[in-house]
């Protein structure tokens, strides 16, 4: 174990600024990377090389693993918490990646929660804020809004920035492509998905060959609440609602129970459209089916300027958060001033800390449109069963239900 790693095990208590911060700064200033892993240090001591795949346990992991339990008799004092935050800030300032997974496939956020720190605790929230900053920075870089200076002396700095940024990516998705392998185009690419055969089972809609979960009946309670949100600010004379992505029709059945005036459904997959025809959705008097991708069909409504919605819901498969950013541009033109927009919120739900990061990112993004996102936290009564599904798309025991309205 290197001096840097040993320091972050907190060998001395109390954790004081004078005992830890100057030494941490000295080590990092001397050139030890803030991403220097335990595996790299061990390999160096043995005179061996370590591959990137074998090297995961960063100084931030060691710091978080060394925190005393929040509920134990040796819990941190307020002064110690303040010092720990300064140590974390210093590591992050020197390029520590916030989103690495250690030798047990654990995120630093997982380690903090395991030690019983609540999700509103300042240490956990510092990790979430680092994730939000990294995601927004990455978006700026990918969008070409940041120009790197082309200078030989800056080449190493630029390379380090790119490496750190790559390590900090969260793949924001709706459903389907969470941790999808590169070759699994069905889950990762909308065009491929629309050409893929689907199968309805007793409790799910899955891709026929890969067994990717498109929609499952554990979402029923979520869809019931969502349907009520969509009509919560309904007009007295009429209520017009849009659902983007029919799937199993769970939320659409709940919307019908609300006796809406007009119920628009936008669906692009031919197998789902065939199921809708078979089950009579095309024959319902108050239902309008928009066949095709929302990217074209909703823009047609926007151009016509004749239909505006009390509620809009979004739940698609194999689309990314970038698609939602594009959707916001359309939503603001189709939603009534008092209307509600909501969506199936599986953004980053592969682990709690990523879920919390995207919770904040959505709040920031919709604020750019003069909208406010409020969440209801639902403890899931029925947890997902992934036995007959290729991969999970939701791994939290609770659900952040979003309600987005103009502020």
Curated annotation (Swiss-Prot):
GO biological process: methylation
GO molecular function, one term: protein arginine N5-methyltransferase activity
The protein's name in its UniProt record: Protein arginine N-methyltransferase 2
The keyword Ubl conjugation belongs to this UniProt entry's keyword annotation: no
Similarity comment: Belongs to the class I-like SAM-binding methyltransferase superfamily. RMT2 methyltransferase family.
Assembly with partners or alone: Monomer.
Keyword Amino-acid biosynthesis among record annotations: no
Subcellular location as annotated: Cytoplasm; Nucleus
Top class in the EC scheme: transferase
Gene: RMT2
Role noted for this protein: S-adenosyl-L-methionine-dependent protein-arginine N-methyltransferase that methylates the delta-nitrogen atom of arginine residues to form N5-methylarginine (type IV) in target proteins. Monomethylates ribosomal protein L12.
EC assignment: 2.1.1.-
């Amino acid at each position: 174990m290197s001096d840097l790693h040993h320091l972050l095990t907190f060998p001395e208590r109390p954790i004081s600024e004078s005992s830890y911060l100057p030494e941490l700064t000295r080590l990092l200033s001397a050139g030890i990377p803030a991403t220097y892993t335990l595996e790299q240090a061990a390999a160096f001591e043995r005179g061996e090389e370590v591959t990137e795949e074998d090297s995961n346990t960063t100084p931030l992991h060691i710091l978080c693993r060394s925190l005393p339990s929040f509920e134990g008799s040796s819990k941190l004092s307020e002064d110690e918490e303040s010092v720990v935050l300064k140590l974390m800030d210093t590591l992050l300032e020197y390029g520590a990646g916030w989103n690495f997974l250690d030798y047990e496939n654990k995120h630093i956020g997982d380690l903090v929660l395991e030690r019983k720190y609540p999700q509103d605790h300042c240490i956990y929230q510092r990790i979430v804020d680092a994730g939000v900053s990294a995601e927004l920075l990455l978006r700026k870089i990918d969008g070409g809004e940041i120009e790197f200076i082309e200078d030989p002396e800056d080449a190493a700095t630029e390379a380090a920035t790119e490496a750190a940024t790559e390590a900090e990516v969260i793949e924001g998705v709706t459903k389907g492509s969470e941790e999808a392998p590169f070759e699994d185009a069905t889950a990762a690419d909308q065009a491929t998905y629309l050409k893929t055969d689907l199968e309805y089972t007793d409790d799910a809609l899955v891709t026929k060959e890969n067994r990717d979960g498109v929609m499952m009946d554990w979402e029923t309670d979520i869809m019931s609440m969502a349907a009520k949100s969509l009509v919560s600010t309904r007009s007295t004379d009429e209520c017009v609602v849009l659902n983007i992505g029919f799937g199993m029709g769970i939320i659409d059945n709940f919307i019908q129970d609300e006796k809406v005036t007009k119920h628009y459904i936008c669906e692009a997959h031919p197998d789902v459209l065939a199921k809708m025809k078979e089950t009579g959705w095309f024959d319902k008097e108050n239902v309008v089916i928009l066949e095709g991708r929302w990217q074209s069909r909703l823009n047609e409504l926007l151009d016509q300027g004749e239909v505006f919605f009390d509620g809009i819901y979004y739940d698609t498969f194999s689309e990314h958060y970038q698609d939602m950013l594009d959707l916001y541009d359309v939503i603001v033109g189709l939603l009534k001033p008092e209307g509600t927009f909501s969506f199936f919120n599986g953004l980053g739900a592969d682990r709690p800390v990523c879920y919390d990061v995207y919770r904040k990112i959505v709040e920031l993004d919709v604020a750019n449109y003069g909208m406010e996102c409020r969440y209801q936290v639902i403890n899931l009564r029925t947890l997902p069963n992934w036995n007959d599904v290729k991969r999970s798309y939701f791994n939290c025991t609770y659900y952040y239900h979003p309600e987005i309205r103009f502020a």
